[in-house]
């Protein structure tokens, strides 16, 4: 891609995200989301491959439908109440349609079918942007309108997402699809806690962004997109591979790693809100996700593929990829647990 075009696309991607997040008017928020969608499509199609074109088309159609529903919801609310403010979403129909529109943009179940297919057709770098940066604006809008939303609807969407996210990743062999279902499951945890404690949703979102970014950076460093190629990662970058298993276990929510902290707090909060059945179901659904994370960990650490004697020497050559960001991300995604007691006070 032309450097000038690339800089314009990245600037639009960043600025319109901030417009959508900081706006208090529905029309401006919708405009920010729309331009943000249009800005990422050139990044999706920069590799001229049929899968990339198909992924960008699916993404555009899904996001266009979600944006149309969001605009309908805000127009309906403005027609009935005379208010365009995001904080004045009072009509029940508008609240329900707005929730569905934002969940469709995020890829929450049962509106999740586009996410694994789109992510599979993208490069790891674009997939990283789609799985992290593109979640910020819809989550910020959800955070603002959380008090007005229908709690049973949110809990149903959250529980469905955690179950489908865990169940869908069990039989996958493509790493990008596994990360897509992982994203769906994590978003389900966030939506489930949103009606009770929006602050915990922000904590969960922050740790999810760190862990997912780390995993995408690791996969980009070792050039792996399939489970079968993970077994050769030891010969490429031994130290990165050793730390990546901690990231995988952290994504699975095992203590005392970073991913355990938000799940612990969420279950504690749900139990205190007398929703013990929901908390138990969420905890059991996390076992589904943990299974395929453990499978990836087993392949990375305890298996080795047949290779020549020269293959074991590739790590001796200096890598040309910058690793400072990856090093920081690996530490944050694995060892943020020492600061967790401070969040209890």
From Swiss-Prot:
Q: Which GO terms describe its cellular component?
A: mitochondrial inner membrane; respiratory chain complex I
Set out the biological process GO terms recorded for this chain's protein. mitochondrial electron transport, NADH to ubiquinone; mitochondrial respiratory chain complex I assembly
Q: What Enzyme Commission number(s) does the record list for this chain?
A: 7.1.1.2
Transmembrane is among the record's keywords:
yes
Q: Which UniProt keywords apply?
A: Electron transport, Membrane, Mitochondrion, Mitochondrion inner membrane, NAD, Respiratory chain, Translocase, Transmembrane, Transmembrane helix, Transport, Ubiquinone
Q: Which domain of life is it from?
A: Eukaryota
Q: Where are the transmembrane segments?
A: 25-45, 60-80, 99-119, 149-171, 178-198, 199-219, 242-262, 282-302, 324-344
UniProt GO MF annotations: NADH dehydrogenase (ubiquinone) activity
- Compartment list: Mitochondrion inner membrane
Coiled coil ranges: none
What is said about its interaction partners and assembly?
Core subunit of respiratory chain NADH dehydrogenase (Complex I) which is composed of 45 different subunits.
Q: Which PANTHER family match?
A: NADH-UBIQUINONE OXIDOREDUCTASE CHAIN 2
Name of the protein: NADH-ubiquinone oxidoreductase chain 2
